[in-house]
């Protein structure tokens, strides 16, 4: 089977780290062992510096929505061109913590940025490049933020309003319903049930790829 790019998406507190472990375990069970991990924003030296700016901001200066969006795409193109595409070319599988769907949901939905701008930027930066499979972990903003707060101090984006995350989730769900490559998993359930659902979804998808 050819190498694939699998992305895990969801709101803060959706359980992406646990999901990654479940995905890797299932891939290994199917004999896939050459796997690399990526995260967005980040994943290269430049992208990691941009991650810090995006998540923490700069003291005394407001980060505009447009600046945030452009930094995200700058980090993304560095990761895609310098890490993800080379890994796929050599036959490795890539499991990513977030990708472009996050921008479509957070900036397009949460921030309410212009859809035309979002699509133009996506096309200019990524072209036709897209994940082979996206696993969207769906949680309500209330549950997600409760889990995120339990982890400790919140970053700049995690401190956004409940309405922001409600809009973000609505955009996630709308995008998922319109794209068969995005599989939605109910992540409000107990961990064991979420893990089982992820593994079942991934197994079925892998069988379809053969």
Swiss-Prot record:
InterPro entries: P-loop_NTPase, Thymidylate_kin-like_dom, Thymidylate_kin_CS, Thymidylate_kinase. It is an enzyme of class 2 (transferase). One of its GO terms (biological process) is dTDP biosynthetic process. It comes from Erwinia tasmaniensis (strain DSM 17950 / CFBP 7177 / CIP 109463 / NCPPB 4357 / Et1/99). ATP binds at residues 10-17. The keyword Metal-binding does not apply. The keyword rRNA processing does not apply. This is Thymidylate kinase. One of its GO terms (cellular component) is cytosol. Belongs to the thymidylate kinase family.
């Amino acid at each position: 089977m050819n190498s694939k790019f699998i992305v895990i998406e969801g709101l803060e507190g959706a359980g992406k780290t646990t999901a990654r472990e479940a995905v890797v375990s299932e891939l290994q069970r199917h004999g896939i062992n050459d796997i690399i991990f990526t995260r967005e924003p980040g994943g290269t030296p430049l992208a990691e510096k941009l991650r810090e700016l995006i998540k923490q901001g700069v003291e005394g200066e407001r980060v505009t929505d447009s600046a945030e969006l452009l930094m995200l795409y700058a980090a993304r193109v560095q990761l895609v061109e310098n890490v993800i595409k080379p890994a796929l070319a050599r036959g490795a599988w890539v499991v990513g913590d977030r990708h472009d769907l996050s921008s479509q949901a957070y900036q397009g939905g949460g921030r309410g940025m212009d859809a035309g701008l979002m699509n133009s930027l996506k096309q200019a930066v990524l072209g036709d490049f897209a994940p082979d499979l996206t696993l969207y972990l769906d949680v309500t903003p209330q549950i997600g933020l409760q889990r995120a707060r339990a982890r400790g101090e919140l970053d700049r984006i995690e401190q956004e309003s409940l309405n922001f995350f409600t809009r973000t989730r609505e955009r996630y769900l709308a995008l998922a319903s319109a794209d068969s490559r995005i599989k939605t998993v109910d992540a409000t359930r107990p961990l064991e049930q979420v893990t089982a659902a992820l593994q079942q979804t991934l197994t079925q998808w892998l069988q379809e790829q053969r």
